[in-house]
From Swiss-Prot:
Induction and repression of expression: By p53/TP53, UV irradiation, by hydrogen peroxide treatment or by treatment with a DNA-damaging reagent.
Basic and acidic residues bias spans: 16-26, 114-130, 138-167
UniProt superkingdom: Eukaryota
Quaternary organization: Interacts with p53/TP53.
rRNA processing keyword on record: no
UniProt function note: May play a significant role in p53/TP53-mediating signaling pathway.
Organism (species): Homo sapiens (Human)
Any matching Pfam family: TP53IP5
Principal localisation: cytoplasm
UniProt entry tagged with the keyword Nucleotide-binding: no
GO cellular component: chromosome; cytoplasm; nucleolus; nucleus
Tissue-specificity statement: Highly expressed in heart, brain and small intestine. Less abundant in skeletal muscle, spleen, prostate, ovary and colon. A smaller transcript is expressed specifically in the testis.
Name of the protein: TP53-target gene 5 protein
Subcellular location: Cytoplasm; Nucleus
């Protein structure tokens, strides 16, 4: 036994499932995976915005549109080559049912063969006699039917006539035999129609479909940033930035211009300049120059 043969799984179904997963991963290019992840992030951000700003109609419409797009991806996996959980589960159940049916048929055949091989000669004789009796009864019935007169032979039970509604619709008679056999349901391809218009119809094999009306990027509101951390807020002095200001709308203070101050500004300028000049050479401001 080689080491490669030992590593192989004993169950053939497990190996088949692994091969199918690898094929799905190789078939989907990198761009498709990126676009699917982008749609997922857009849906998450829109759901957060809906929680924060529930009264905004624009955000609600975008959230509904994103949900439709996501459900359409799950409902049409074959067209977009996406393996959804529901379809894989259905396929698994179908495969298991088929396998169980095959196993049941094989077991019945084996049991019948065993009975034939290990059966008693008396039972065999009884079976042969029973089959001969049944064939004789059938032949008697055929001869009795042939001996009946022609008039009685041709008399058949009258077929109940259809009502007026059925007579008006000739297609009803053609539909009746179809219901007896197995019904086949044909699912029409689901076409997404957004309020912005039809989706971009692109080649699925080469390009990925992006849905119209959805934003590619969503800017969530930024959290409030404090000027200092909680440990240093009371130790160090206050900073010039307002603590409760957010990044989106910083705080600003409007300055009111006083009329009296502007008028008296020129008159007081001369007195202030003289006082400053005298103070530089005096003893009052001597501490500054020491």
């Amino acid at each position: 036994m080689s080491p490669s043969a030992k590593k192989r799984p004993k169950n053939s179904r497990v190996s088949k499932m692994q091969d199918e997963k690898l094929r799905d991963e190789t078939e989907q290019p990198v761009s498709k995976v990126i676009e699917r992840n982008r749609l997922r992030t857009v849906l998450k951000n829109l759901s957060l915005l809906k929680l924060l700003k529930s009264s905004n109609r624009r955000i609600q419409e975008l959230h509904k549109l994103a949900k439709r797009c996501w459900h359409s991806l799950l409902s049409v996996p074959k067209i977009l080559r996406i393996s959804s959980g529901e379809n894989s589960a259905c396929n698994k159940t179908k495969q298991n049912n088929e396998e169980f049916q095959e196993i049941g048929c094989s077991e019945k055949e084996l049991k019948s063969k065993k009975l034939e091989s290990t059966g008693d000669p008396k039972k065999k004789e009884y079976k042969e006699w029973k089959s001969q009796v049944q064939s004789g009864m059938r032949n008697k019935e055929k001869t009795s039917l042939a001996a009946m007169p022609r008039k009685e032979k041709h008399i058949e039970p009258e077929v109940p006539r259809t009502s007026r509604d059925d007579s008006l619709n000739p297609g009803v008679q053609g539909r009746q035999p179809l219901t007896e056999g197995p019904r086949v349901i044909f699912i029409k391809p689901y076409r997404n129609r957004t309020p912005m218009g039809h989706m971009k119809q692109l080649d699925v094999a080469d390009q990925w479909i992006w849905f119209e009306g959805l934003p590619t990027r969503i800017h969530l509101p930024a959290p409030r940033v404090m000027c200092r951390s909680s440990t240093l807020r009371w130790v160090k002095r206050r900073c010039t930035r307002f603590c409760s200001a957010s990044l989106e709308m910083p705080m600003w203070h409007p300055y009111k211009v006083d009329v009296t101050w502007t008028r008296a500004r020129g008159a007081s300028r001369g007195w202030r300049s003289r006082h400053q000049l005298k103070g530089r050479n005096g003893w009052r401001n001597s501490r500054v120059y020491k």
